[in-house]
Curated annotation (Swiss-Prot):
It comes from Corynebacterium efficiens (strain DSM 44549 / YS-314 / AJ 12310 / JCM 11189 / NBRC 100395). NCBIfam families: L21 (TIGR00061). It holds the Pfam family Ribosomal_L21p. This is Large ribosomal subunit protein bL21. The gene is rplU. HAMAP family: Ribosomal_bL21 (MF_01363).
Length: 101
């Protein structure tokens, strides 16, 4: 059984027991988080009806907070000697899916 959930502006396909890296969610490691909205559930049959999915949630547990890979940004203007370097690391949360109900 799997589900497709939307969090942090992205969609993730999850199944029970999966570890998923998502945009940062506030909470301490070990805390439980319910992910909604659920866009699709596949069990005995595929469910995409909004009225049936309103009662479905994906229960997860926060495993850890981490950072993604460093992204390097360089602004450069020709002939003027203007250069600006910048770096960024996105904050992520690792979730473990404990159940789809």
């Amino acid at each position: 059984m799997y589900a497709i959930v939307k969090t942090g502006g992205k969609q993730y396909k999850v199944a029970e027991g999966d570890l998923v890296k998502v945009e940062k969610i506030e909470g301490e490691p070990g805390a439980s988080v319910a992910l909604t909205p659920v866009l699709l559930v596949d069990g005995a049959d595929v469910t995409t009806a909004a009225d049936k999915l309103a009662s479905v949630s994906v229960n997860t547990e926060i495993v850890e907070h981490t950072k993604g890979p460093k992204i390097k940004i360089l602004k450069y203007k020709n002939k003027t000697g203007y250069k600006k370097r910048q770096g960024h690391r996105q904050k992520l949360t690792v979730l473990k899916v404990t159940g789809i109900k």
